[in-house]
């Protein structure tokens, strides 16, 4: 489950009561709201949607080996919404409210899966400072340390506190692979240490150095690795689409200062890294790592719970073998969201299972390379992928992208197979391929 983007201000009348209450009291306050329907398209997750998703996840998979959340726990524009709704919107009151929100989310996850390790990554909205402004060694990391350490539980490795407090990085070893969580928010082209100092160490370079140490240790121990992070590499195709001009407006997800050494590092350890997992773009998608000279890795991208960009809310289950290989995955969607918000109960259903939908044996580099060829060359496969991308939402392409929707499918498809900017430009600006 990714990109929860939980909005406790969805009913602004409740904010002052929430501010003065303990997080364990929040469910009763939310239940007092007149609005008990799940968040609509164009809005972040409210309590009704979060509660429904957690309940359905538990029904679908009662005893998972672990639960992975690739970031963005907090709603978009969190500070602006808080200031508009709260009587006291001082910096101290805001920090306390954000802290309580993180505590509340952790409490709901723990109550739903009391015997399961819960493994979170941080997203770009998870900060006191603002979007893409997490302060290294700052108060948000300090305040969330006990929350996240409790979620990770006994899997927390030696050095967990130090690594989290520094940059929000950590690693754990589960049944099968070692899981490494580098904070790729620091790699983002949008990142700015707005609450820090010019004298602070570069968090992106520090995270790359830490990741290299972790991968080297895994290789020595002959461990297979899953990487889990929020922002995937490659092209920021949503921004690229909205800018319109081609090829000058192609926007990368990461600064090249970090992207190039990351690519070199993951290529060097490609025999150790089984897969990477990301979120951020809210879509059900994937990325192939490499380029025209060959691929060496892949990144399944988990769709969002939040329907703010017009996708159907979703979560995903993954099955793996003892070595960390991915056998299959199933995406679950909140279907008929339009009807649900008009009073009918929300209906969760399995949208598709990878091996059944694509007739591919498992999720690995060979299968995803073949899938990319299928959606490039076969119109029927491309149409199916086009449906799955926004989790079968009937409104995403027309409502969210407007005129850019005409180029949207090509932009997304080129991003799946072309991570490097020149290659993406040739694909997108040249009409595909």
Task: Label the predicted regions.
Residues 1-69, 140-221, 283-433:
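Metal-dependent phosphoesterase/phosphodiesterase active-site architecture
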Residues 73-76, 88-91, 95, 172-174, ...:
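Catalytic cores of eukaryotic secretory-pathway lumenal/extracellular enzymes that build
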Residues 7-10, 75-78, 120-131, 188-190, ...:
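Active-site environment of divalent metal-dependent phosphoester hydrolases
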Residues 189-208, 218-273:
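Active-site-proximal segments of metal-dependent phosphoesterases and phosphodiesterases across multiple
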Residues 91-110, 139-162, 251-262:
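Acidic, His- and aromatic-enriched active-site or binding-groove loops in soluble protein domains
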Residues 1-2, 65-72, 114-123, 227-230, ...:
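Active-site neighborhood of phospho(di)ester-bond hydrolases with catalytic His/Asp-centered motifs
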Residues 57-61, 104-117, 154, 217-221, ...:
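A structural motif corresponding to the C-terminal end of an alpha-helix
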Residues 23-28, 32-135:
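Core catalytic region of metal-dependent phosphoesterases/phosphodiesterases
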């Amino acid at each position: 489950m990714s990109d929860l983007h939980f909005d406790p201000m969805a009913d602004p009348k409740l904010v002052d009561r929430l501010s003065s209450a303990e997080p364990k009291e929040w469910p009763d306050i939310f239940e007092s709201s007149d609005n008990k329907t799940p968040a609509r398209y164009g809005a972040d997750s409210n309590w009704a949607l979060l509660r429904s998703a957690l309940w359905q996840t538990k029904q679908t998979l009662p005893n998972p080996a672990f639960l992975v959340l690739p970031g963005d726990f907090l709603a978009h524009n969190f500070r602006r919404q808080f200031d508009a709704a709260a009587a006291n919107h001082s910096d101290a009151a805001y920090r306390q409210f954000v802290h309580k929100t993180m505590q509340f989310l952790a409490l709901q996850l723990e109550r739903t899966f009391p015997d399961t390790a819960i493994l979170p990554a941080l997203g770009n909205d998870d900060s006191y400072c603002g979007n893409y402004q997490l302060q290294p060694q700052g108060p948000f990391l300090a305040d969330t340390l006990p929350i996240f350490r409790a979620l990770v539980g006994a899997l927390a490795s030696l050095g967990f506190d130090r690594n989290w407090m520094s940059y929000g990085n950590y690693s754990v070893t589960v049944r099968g692979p070692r899981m490494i969580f580098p904070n790729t928010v620091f790699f983002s082209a949008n990142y700015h240490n707005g609450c820090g100092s010019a004298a602070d160490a570069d968090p992106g370079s520090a995270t790359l150095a830490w990741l290299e140490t972790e991968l080297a240790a895994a290789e020595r121990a002959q461990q297979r690795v899953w990487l889990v992070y929020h922002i995937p590499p490659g092209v920021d195709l949503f921004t690229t689409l909205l800018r319109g001009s081609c090829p000058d407006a192609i926007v990368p997800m990461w600064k090249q200062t970090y992207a190039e050494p990351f690519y070199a590092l993951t290529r060097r350890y490609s025999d150790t890294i089984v897969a990477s997992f990301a979120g951020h773009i809210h879509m059900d998608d994937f990325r192939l790592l490499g380029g025209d000279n060959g691929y060496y890795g892949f990144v399944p991208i988990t769709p969002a719970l939040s329907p703010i960009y017009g996708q159907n809310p979703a979560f995903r289950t993954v099955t793996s073998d003892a070595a960390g290989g991915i056998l299959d995955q199933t995406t679950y969607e909140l279907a008929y969201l339009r009807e649900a918000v008009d009073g009918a109960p929300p209906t969760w259903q399995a949208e598709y299972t990878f091996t059944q939908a694509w007739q591919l044996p498992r999720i690995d580099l060979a299968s995803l390379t073949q899938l990319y060829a299928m959606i490039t060359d076969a119109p029927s496969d491309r149409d199916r992928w086009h449906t799955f991308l926004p989790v079968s939402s009937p409104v995403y392409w027309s409502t969210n992208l407007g005129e850019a929707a005409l180029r949207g499918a090509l932009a997304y498809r080129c991003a799946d197979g072309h991570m490097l900017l020149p290659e993406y430009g040739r694909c997108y600006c040249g009409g595909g391929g």
